[in-house]
Amino acid sequence: MKESQTQPPGTAVPGGFQTVKKLLKRPRFWYNRNGGVVVDEWKKDARRDVVFVDIDALVPKDHLLRKIEKVMDYEWLYERLDPYYCHDNGRPGTDPVVLIKMVLIQHLYGIPSLRQTYQRIQDTLSYRWFLGYGLLDTIPHFATVSYAFCKRFPTELTEEIFAHILNKALNNRMLDPTMIFMDGTHIKASANKKKYQKEKVAKTAKIYAEQLREEVNAEREKLGKKPIEEDDHDDDEPGGGTVERTVSTTDPESGMFVKGEHERQFAYEAHTACDRKGFVVGVEITAGNIHDSVAWDALYDQVTDRFPEAEFITMDAGYKTPWIAKKILDDGRIPILPYTNHHYKIGTYKPWEYEYDPKEDCFFCPNGGRLRHTTTDKEGKRIYRSNAKHCRGCPFKAVCGANEKGQKILSTHIWQEYLDLVEQLRRTDRGKEIYAMRKETIERVFADAKEKHAMRYTHHRGLARVTNWVRLKYAAMNLKKLAEWSWINSIFHHVFMLFYPIYVKTPVFAS
């Protein structure tokens, strides 16, 4: 086809290139905006060039790994791990700090596995620089890293790394532990949800069971009731003392988590606490079928032992139980919990429509009927019952919600006054302000962990391995925040930003 005589700007001149050979041999001709011809020579293939290069100059000055190197010290790691290496026998071992750095790279950049981390370090210059390796140095195999953490290093090393980074942030005044936010998030387990078996397991004993039993028996004694024995587990009742669980045959320590109406999967749950600035200050890992309120005590004790100055403890509705409210208030701290709906049958009297008389310890219904305190059960519930004879001729019987015997039954917990105080705190302006911070603190931690650091699912199996995996992930997140904030607060940052327009990231080659 005959070429057009006129060419629009930005296209080749007439008699352009016919073949790839001519394209490589001849220069390019382009029209510029002023109508002139610009010659652009083809760039030479430099993939096989041999050069002397300064590796440090190739890593950008504002790279995350540079910031981490400025805030981290590794001497304590050498001292801690020295007993686990032999210095006078066998072949030279791999530097333990290098192995730990490889794991930090995995969690900092959300790489799913150590195998992929090893592959990326091979051809990523900044990762090699962070490890202290040259372009031709052999990277430690991923199996070496895995073996070190599974067999050689002590099991408490991950907790020590987590605590060390947290203490650094505290010493740099980056933490605000006066406000603690707690919640749990599920992590999909490495287990087929179709491979399971049903097992009967013992019910989990409650930490506060002994204290509750003593207070319940004191009330039952006043009411003339028989005390509840310590070994009363109702073993004679069907299913008493045990509960049937769905147990994975692949990873028995995970738990079946029901997500929505239909989705079911085996998972672990990371019960996490963070401060007002988003630093993770504590974590407990359980199976996915363990309720938040059951795992709360271990997490609360861990955080308050580390930060006794904690003043506000903020949680969602899953933690709104009498025991949690009592323990926090008895410790002199303030629980911040949300509103929860009252459970009652639609079309009947609301629970708050019954008036309580503390002097006589009874309730009065809207029609004036009295509900007396008859007993207190082993769960700590005070049972109030009406007189069936009085209720028989009541005109409001249809909206009362009485049982088949014609009695109206109400129940409150033995520690109900603590929940009432929590409700008063919830209505304060300060309480509303603090609870609104959940979305930018603990919820943000979970979002970053899953979207940026690959915590949505785990390849590890077993509670101990998943616990170490999550702690290292949270340690990396805290380290990243610590490094970034230290960089922002440094004088070098301000100098860098001042000259950033003329800063050119070009390698410096040796002459």
Residue ranges of model-derived segments:
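Positively charged, structured surface patches that bind polyanionic biopolymers
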Residues: G36-M72, H87
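A Lys/Arg-rich helix-loop hairpin that forms a DNA/phosphate-binding surface
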Residues: G90-R91, G132-T138
